[in-house]
UniProtKB/Swiss-Prot annotation:
Pathway: Cell wall biogenesis; peptidoglycan recycling. This is Beta-hexosaminidase. Keywords: Cell cycle, Cell division, Cell shape, Cell wall biogenesis/degradation, Cytoplasm, Glycosidase, Hydrolase, Peptidoglycan synthesis. InterPro entries: Beta_hexosaminidase_bac (IPR022956), Glyco_hydro_3_AS (IPR019800), Glyco_hydro_3_N (IPR001764), Glyco_hydro_3_N_sf (IPR036962), Glycoside_hydrolase_SF (IPR017853), NagZ_Beta-hexosaminidase (IPR050226). One of its GO terms (molecular function) is beta-N-acetylhexosaminidase activity. Disulfide bonds: none annotated. The keyword Cell division applies. The gene is nagZ. Belongs to the glycosyl hydrolase 3 family. NagZ subfamily. GO terms for cellular component: cytoplasm. The record marks D179 as: Important for catalytic activity. The lineage of its organism: Bacteria, Pseudomonadati, Pseudomonadota, Betaproteobacteria, Nitrosomonadales. Its EC number is 3.2.1.52. It comes from Nitrosospira multiformis (strain ATCC 25196 / NCIMB 11849 / C 71).
Length: 349
Protein backbone atom coordinates (compact mmCIF):
# COMPACT_ATOMS: atom_id res chain seq x y z
CA UNK A 1 0.00 0.00 0.00
CA UNK A 2 1.52 3.31 -1.08
CA UNK A 3 1.53 6.40 1.12
CA UNK A 4 -1.56 8.58 1.17
CA UNK A 5 -1.89 12.39 1.14
CA UNK A 6 -2.80 12.93 4.83
CA UNK A 7 -0.59 13.55 7.87
CA UNK A 8 -2.29 13.04 11.23
CA UNK A 9 -1.28 13.29 14.88
CA UNK A 10 -1.65 10.67 17.61
CA UNK A 11 -2.97 10.73 21.15
CA UNK A 12 -0.03 10.14 23.48
CA UNK A 13 3.34 8.52 24.06
CA UNK A 14 2.34 5.13 22.65
CA UNK A 15 0.02 3.99 19.90
CA UNK A 16 -3.53 3.18 20.93
CA UNK A 17 -5.71 0.72 19.05
CA UNK A 18 -7.53 3.71 17.54
CA UNK A 19 -4.23 5.29 16.46
CA UNK A 20 -3.21 2.08 14.70
CA UNK A 21 -6.56 1.84 12.93
CA UNK A 22 -6.28 5.42 11.63
CA UNK A 23 -2.65 5.13 10.59
CA UNK A 24 -3.35 1.98 8.58
CA UNK A 25 -5.95 3.85 6.52
CA UNK A 26 -4.82 4.16 2.87
CA UNK A 27 -5.31 7.94 2.91
CA UNK A 28 -2.65 8.36 5.60
CA UNK A 29 0.95 8.94 4.60
CA UNK A 30 2.53 10.27 7.75
CA UNK A 31 2.40 11.22 11.42
CA UNK A 32 3.32 14.52 13.05
CA UNK A 33 4.52 14.34 16.64
CA UNK A 34 4.03 16.92 19.40
CA UNK A 35 5.41 17.47 22.90
CA UNK A 36 2.62 15.31 24.32
CA UNK A 37 4.04 12.37 22.35
CA UNK A 38 7.41 12.55 24.11
CA UNK A 39 8.50 11.41 27.56
CA UNK A 40 12.00 10.04 26.97
CA UNK A 41 14.40 9.12 24.19
CA UNK A 42 13.78 5.41 24.70
CA UNK A 43 10.03 5.96 24.51
CA UNK A 44 10.35 8.09 21.36
CA UNK A 45 12.53 5.50 19.64
CA UNK A 46 10.01 2.78 20.46
CA UNK A 47 7.13 4.95 19.23
CA UNK A 48 8.73 5.83 15.89
CA UNK A 49 9.73 2.19 15.34
CA UNK A 50 6.15 1.13 16.04
CA UNK A 51 4.80 3.71 13.58
CA UNK A 52 7.26 2.67 10.88
CA UNK A 53 6.36 -1.01 11.39
CA UNK A 54 2.65 -0.44 10.71
CA UNK A 55 2.93 -0.12 6.94
CA UNK A 56 5.04 -0.94 3.90
CA UNK A 57 6.40 1.43 2.76
CA UNK A 58 6.68 2.94 6.25
CA UNK A 59 4.72 6.04 7.15
CA UNK A 60 6.70 9.28 7.34
CA UNK A 61 7.30 10.62 10.86
CA UNK A 62 7.57 14.40 11.13
CA UNK A 63 7.83 17.06 13.83
CA UNK A 64 8.05 20.84 14.24
CA UNK A 65 11.56 21.09 15.67
CA UNK A 66 13.03 24.43 14.60
CA UNK A 67 14.84 25.64 17.71
CA UNK A 68 13.94 28.31 20.24
CA UNK A 69 10.32 28.21 21.32
CA UNK A 70 9.41 25.70 18.60
CA UNK A 71 11.27 22.60 19.75
CA UNK A 72 8.90 19.75 20.59
CA UNK A 73 11.46 17.50 22.28
CA UNK A 74 13.64 19.09 24.95
CA UNK A 75 14.76 16.72 27.70
CA UNK A 76 17.79 14.72 26.47
CA UNK A 77 17.89 16.76 23.26
CA UNK A 78 20.34 19.58 22.57
CA UNK A 79 18.91 23.04 23.17
CA UNK A 80 18.63 24.65 19.75
CA UNK A 81 18.74 28.46 19.55
CA UNK A 82 16.05 30.63 17.97
CA UNK A 83 17.07 31.29 14.38
CA UNK A 84 17.10 35.05 15.00
CA UNK A 85 20.20 34.50 17.15
CA UNK A 86 22.04 33.21 14.09
CA UNK A 87 20.92 36.34 12.29
CA UNK A 88 22.44 38.49 15.02
CA UNK A 89 25.75 36.69 14.61
CA UNK A 90 25.47 37.20 10.84
CA UNK A 91 25.44 40.97 11.35
CA UNK A 92 28.98 40.85 12.76
CA UNK A 93 30.44 37.60 11.44
CA UNK A 94 28.61 36.17 8.40
CA UNK A 95 31.02 33.26 7.90
CA UNK A 96 30.72 32.23 11.55
CA UNK A 97 26.92 32.46 11.35
CA UNK A 98 26.85 30.22 8.29
CA UNK A 99 29.05 27.66 10.05
CA UNK A 100 26.90 27.70 13.18
CA UNK A 101 23.73 27.34 11.09
CA UNK A 102 25.23 24.24 9.48
CA UNK A 103 26.16 22.83 12.89
CA UNK A 104 22.67 23.55 14.27
CA UNK A 105 21.09 21.77 11.31
CA UNK A 106 23.42 18.81 11.72
CA UNK A 107 22.70 18.42 15.45
CA UNK A 108 18.96 18.90 14.94
CA UNK A 109 18.81 16.23 12.25
CA UNK A 110 21.28 13.79 13.79
CA UNK A 111 19.34 13.62 17.06
CA UNK A 112 15.95 13.31 15.39
CA UNK A 113 17.16 10.68 12.91
CA UNK A 114 18.71 8.67 15.76
CA UNK A 115 15.28 8.72 17.42
CA UNK A 116 13.53 7.56 14.23
CA UNK A 117 12.04 10.87 13.05
CA UNK A 118 12.19 11.31 9.27
CA UNK A 119 12.08 15.10 8.99
CA UNK A 120 11.30 18.38 10.70
CA UNK A 121 9.26 21.22 9.23
CA UNK A 122 12.22 23.59 9.07
CA UNK A 123 13.72 26.07 8.13
CA UNK A 124 11.52 29.14 8.51
CA UNK A 125 12.13 31.34 5.45
CA UNK A 126 9.88 34.21 6.54
CA UNK A 127 11.38 37.67 6.94
CA UNK A 128 11.78 39.15 10.42
CA UNK A 129 9.84 42.39 10.04
CA UNK A 130 9.46 42.52 13.83
CA UNK A 131 5.67 42.68 13.77
CA UNK A 132 4.39 39.12 13.30
CA UNK A 133 2.97 37.63 16.49
CA UNK A 134 3.69 34.07 15.33
CA UNK A 135 7.01 34.37 13.45
CA UNK A 136 9.12 36.69 15.61
CA UNK A 137 12.44 35.05 16.57
CA UNK A 138 11.71 31.97 14.46
CA UNK A 139 12.95 33.98 11.45
CA UNK A 140 16.65 34.29 10.70
CA UNK A 141 16.78 37.94 9.69
CA UNK A 142 15.17 40.95 8.01
CA UNK A 143 17.57 40.74 5.05
CA UNK A 144 16.34 38.15 2.51
CA UNK A 145 19.90 37.41 1.38
CA UNK A 146 20.95 36.63 4.95
CA UNK A 147 17.92 34.36 5.34
CA UNK A 148 18.81 32.46 2.18
CA UNK A 149 22.45 32.03 3.18
CA UNK A 150 21.69 30.89 6.72
CA UNK A 151 18.84 28.61 5.64
CA UNK A 152 21.08 27.06 2.99
CA UNK A 153 23.72 26.34 5.62
CA UNK A 154 21.15 24.87 7.99
CA UNK A 155 19.78 22.71 5.16
CA UNK A 156 23.26 21.42 4.37
CA UNK A 157 23.60 20.46 8.04
CA UNK A 158 20.28 18.62 7.94
CA UNK A 159 21.35 16.82 4.78
CA UNK A 160 24.67 15.75 6.30
CA UNK A 161 22.69 13.84 8.94
CA UNK A 162 20.28 12.32 6.44
CA UNK A 163 17.30 14.67 6.69
CA UNK A 164 15.37 16.65 4.08
CA UNK A 165 14.35 20.28 4.66
CA UNK A 166 10.91 21.91 4.45
CA UNK A 167 10.84 25.68 3.88
CA UNK A 168 7.97 27.71 5.29
CA UNK A 169 5.69 29.72 5.11
CA UNK A 170 5.52 30.43 1.36
CA UNK A 171 5.36 33.18 0.09
CA UNK A 172 6.06 34.86 3.44
CA UNK A 173 4.20 35.17 6.76
CA UNK A 174 6.43 37.71 8.48
CA UNK A 175 4.91 40.98 7.27
CA UNK A 176 1.52 40.81 8.98
CA UNK A 177 0.88 40.78 12.71
CA UNK A 178 -2.01 38.27 12.79
CA UNK A 179 -1.42 34.62 13.74
CA UNK A 180 -3.10 32.17 11.35
CA UNK A 181 -3.58 29.69 14.20
CA UNK A 182 -6.31 31.99 15.54
CA UNK A 183 -7.44 34.25 12.67
CA UNK A 184 -7.09 34.80 8.93
CA UNK A 185 -4.12 37.10 8.23
CA UNK A 186 -4.40 39.41 5.22
CA UNK A 187 -1.29 40.85 3.55
CA UNK A 188 -2.27 43.80 1.35
CA UNK A 189 1.00 44.08 -0.56
CA UNK A 190 1.24 43.63 -4.31
CA UNK A 191 2.98 40.69 -5.95
CA UNK A 192 5.80 43.01 -7.02
CA UNK A 193 6.39 44.05 -3.40
CA UNK A 194 6.38 40.45 -2.16
CA UNK A 195 8.63 39.32 -5.01
CA UNK A 196 11.13 42.09 -4.25
CA UNK A 197 11.79 40.84 -0.71
CA UNK A 198 9.88 37.88 0.74
CA UNK A 199 10.15 35.59 -2.28
CA UNK A 200 13.94 35.87 -2.47
CA UNK A 201 14.74 33.25 0.22
CA UNK A 202 12.21 30.84 -1.27
CA UNK A 203 13.55 31.31 -4.77
CA UNK A 204 17.15 30.84 -3.66
CA UNK A 205 16.39 27.80 -1.52
CA UNK A 206 14.60 26.17 -4.43
CA UNK A 207 17.76 26.72 -6.44
CA UNK A 208 19.75 25.10 -3.62
CA UNK A 209 17.59 21.96 -3.88
CA UNK A 210 14.93 22.39 -1.18
CA UNK A 211 12.93 19.14 -0.84
CA UNK A 212 9.71 20.35 0.82
CA UNK A 213 7.63 23.51 1.12
CA UNK A 214 4.78 24.64 3.36
CA UNK A 215 2.56 27.54 2.21
CA UNK A 216 1.05 30.09 4.57
CA UNK A 217 -2.57 30.33 5.66
CA UNK A 218 -2.43 33.99 4.59
CA UNK A 219 -4.50 35.86 2.00
CA UNK A 220 -2.66 38.18 -0.38
CA UNK A 221 -5.74 39.80 -1.99
CA UNK A 222 -3.81 41.76 -4.62
CA UNK A 223 -2.59 38.39 -5.94
CA UNK A 224 -5.49 36.01 -5.23
CA UNK A 225 -8.58 35.95 -3.03
CA UNK A 226 -7.63 32.57 -1.56
CA UNK A 227 -4.97 31.89 1.10
CA UNK A 228 -1.68 30.71 -0.40
CA UNK A 229 -2.17 27.12 0.75
CA UNK A 230 -5.47 26.92 -1.14
CA UNK A 231 -4.44 28.99 -4.15
CA UNK A 232 -3.62 27.56 -7.56
CA UNK A 233 -2.15 30.95 -8.40
CA UNK A 234 0.42 30.68 -5.62
CA UNK A 235 1.07 26.94 -5.73
CA UNK A 236 0.78 26.04 -9.40
CA UNK A 237 1.50 29.29 -11.22
CA UNK A 238 4.11 30.86 -8.93
CA UNK A 239 5.68 28.06 -6.88
CA UNK A 240 5.66 25.29 -9.48
CA UNK A 241 5.67 27.46 -12.61
CA UNK A 242 7.67 30.62 -12.06
CA UNK A 243 9.96 29.36 -9.29
CA UNK A 244 10.30 25.83 -10.66
CA UNK A 245 9.78 24.01 -7.35
CA UNK A 246 9.66 20.24 -7.89
CA UNK A 247 9.51 19.08 -4.27
CA UNK A 248 6.71 18.11 -1.91
CA UNK A 249 4.13 20.75 -0.90
CA UNK A 250 2.64 20.28 2.58
CA UNK A 251 -0.40 22.23 3.71
CA UNK A 252 -0.18 23.94 7.06
CA UNK A 253 -2.52 22.48 9.68
CA UNK A 254 -6.07 22.40 8.31
CA UNK A 255 -7.41 22.72 11.86
CA UNK A 256 -6.08 26.28 12.14
CA UNK A 257 -8.39 29.28 11.99
CA UNK A 258 -6.65 30.36 8.79
CA UNK A 259 -8.17 27.32 7.04
CA UNK A 260 -11.71 27.61 8.43
CA UNK A 261 -13.05 29.56 5.42
CA UNK A 262 -12.70 26.43 3.27
CA UNK A 263 -15.49 24.52 5.02
CA UNK A 264 -15.47 21.24 6.90
CA UNK A 265 -12.30 19.12 7.21
CA UNK A 266 -13.01 17.16 4.04
CA UNK A 267 -13.66 20.32 2.02
CA UNK A 268 -10.50 21.93 3.40
CA UNK A 269 -8.41 18.92 2.36
CA UNK A 270 -10.00 18.71 -1.08
CA UNK A 271 -9.40 22.40 -1.77
CA UNK A 272 -5.78 22.28 -0.60
CA UNK A 273 -5.04 19.16 -2.66
CA UNK A 274 -6.77 20.55 -5.76
CA UNK A 275 -4.77 23.78 -5.37
CA UNK A 276 -1.51 21.85 -5.56
CA UNK A 277 -0.62 20.44 -2.13
CA UNK A 278 0.83 16.92 -2.13
CA UNK A 279 0.05 16.31 1.54
CA UNK A 280 -2.34 17.91 4.01
CA UNK A 281 -1.91 18.12 7.78
CA UNK A 282 -4.81 17.78 10.19
CA UNK A 283 -3.87 18.04 13.87
CA UNK A 284 -5.46 18.19 17.32
CA UNK A 285 -8.98 17.32 16.20
CA UNK A 286 -9.71 13.56 16.37
CA UNK A 287 -13.32 13.93 15.24
CA UNK A 288 -12.24 15.89 12.16
CA UNK A 289 -9.63 13.24 11.39
CA UNK A 290 -12.27 10.51 11.54
CA UNK A 291 -14.48 12.50 9.17
CA UNK A 292 -11.62 13.13 6.78
CA UNK A 293 -10.67 9.46 6.55
CA UNK A 294 -14.29 8.42 6.08
CA UNK A 295 -15.20 10.92 3.36
CA UNK A 296 -12.12 12.13 1.46
CA UNK A 297 -11.56 10.58 -1.95
CA UNK A 298 -8.12 11.30 -3.33
CA UNK A 299 -5.56 9.18 -5.13
CA UNK A 300 -2.04 10.50 -4.82
CA UNK A 301 -0.58 10.74 -8.34
CA UNK A 302 2.67 8.96 -9.18
CA UNK A 303 4.65 12.21 -9.05
CA UNK A 304 3.28 12.88 -5.57
CA UNK A 305 4.40 9.44 -4.42
CA UNK A 306 7.91 10.20 -5.68
CA UNK A 307 7.93 13.56 -3.90
CA UNK A 308 6.92 11.92 -0.62
CA UNK A 309 9.61 9.27 -0.97
CA UNK A 310 12.23 12.02 -1.10
CA UNK A 311 11.15 13.16 2.37
CA UNK A 312 12.12 9.87 3.98
CA UNK A 313 15.10 10.02 6.32
CA UNK A 314 18.29 8.37 5.16
CA UNK A 315 18.37 4.71 6.31
CA UNK A 316 20.59 3.46 9.13
CA UNK A 317 21.26 6.71 10.98
CA UNK A 318 23.90 6.81 13.69
CA UNK A 319 22.64 5.65 17.07
CA UNK A 320 22.63 8.08 19.97
CA UNK A 321 25.51 6.20 21.56
CA UNK A 322 27.52 6.43 18.36
CA UNK A 323 26.65 10.12 17.99
CA UNK A 324 27.93 10.93 21.45
CA UNK A 325 31.19 9.18 20.59
CA UNK A 326 31.50 11.15 17.35
CA UNK A 327 33.91 14.09 17.82
CA UNK A 328 32.23 16.07 15.03
CA UNK A 329 28.85 15.79 16.76
CA UNK A 330 30.28 16.64 20.19
CA UNK A 331 32.05 19.66 18.71
CA UNK A 332 28.87 20.84 16.97
CA UNK A 333 26.87 20.58 20.20
CA UNK A 334 29.50 22.60 22.06
CA UNK A 335 29.50 25.30 19.37
CA UNK A 336 25.74 25.88 19.41
CA UNK A 337 25.17 25.38 23.15
CA UNK A 338 25.85 28.99 24.06
CA UNK A 339 24.09 30.72 21.16
CA UNK A 340 21.52 33.14 22.51
CA UNK A 341 22.38 32.46 26.15
CA UNK A 342 22.37 35.74 28.06
CA UNK A 343 24.60 36.67 30.96
CA UNK A 344 23.68 34.70 34.07
CA UNK A 345 22.02 31.87 32.15
CA UNK A 346 23.38 28.36 31.81
CA UNK A 347 23.38 26.60 28.44
CA UNK A 348 21.10 23.57 28.35
CA UNK A 349 23.10 20.93 26.48
Amino acid sequence: MSLGPVILDIEGTQLTANDKKKLRHPLVGGVILFTRNYSSLAQLMHLTAEIHALRTPPLLVAVDHEGGRVQRFREDFTRLPPMRELGRIWDEHPAQARHLAHEAGYVLAAELRAAGVDFSFTPVLDMDYGQSSVIRDRAFHRDPQAIAELAHSLMSGLKSAGMAAVGKHFPGHGYIEADSHFEMPVDERTYAQIEMDDLIPFRKMIGFGLTGMMPAHVIYPKVDALPAGFSEVWLKKVLRGELGFEGCIFSDDLNMAGAAFAGNPVERAQKALHAGCDMVLLCNNPEAAEMLLAELHWDLPALGVIRLARMRGRPNPDSLVKLHENPNFVSAVEKIAGIGVRSGELPLV
